[in-house]
UniProtKB/Swiss-Prot annotation:
Record keywords: Cytolysis, Disulfide bond, Secreted, Toxin
Family in the record: Belongs to the worm cytolysin family.
Domain of life: Eukaryota
Role played: Permeabilizes a variety of cells. Forms large pores which allows the release of large proteins almost as rapidly as small organic molecules and inorganic ions. At sublytic concentrations, the toxin also inhibits protein kinase C and endogenous voltage-gated cation selective (sodium, calcium) channels occurring in the nervous and cardiovascular systems.
Protein name (record): Cerebratulus toxin A-III
Compartments reported by the entry: Secreted
Source organism per UniProt: Cerebratulus lacteus
Amino acid sequence: ISWPSYPGSEGIRSSNCQKKLNCGTKNIATKGVCKAFCLGRKRFWQKCGKNGSGSKGSKVCNAVLAHAVEKAGKGLIAVTDKAVAAIVKLAAGIA
């Protein structure tokens, strides 16, 4: 897996990441998960910099992890949406 290209200082911003993933637009409950993901992603890029070596070649900064972080966003939000929908359905059944 090749190291994903550095998204740039604007690209790693949590607000931009949230916009890209449409955080909380379909369901407010997903906003928290989305925000947490985007903040984690931002910290990852801040730590790992442009080439994945970071300071002292941190073990955190490897291509596999970076690739996973970039790909995880959409899947994470989709799973959360499903979970929220299930909870809402369940709550409606109880009420």
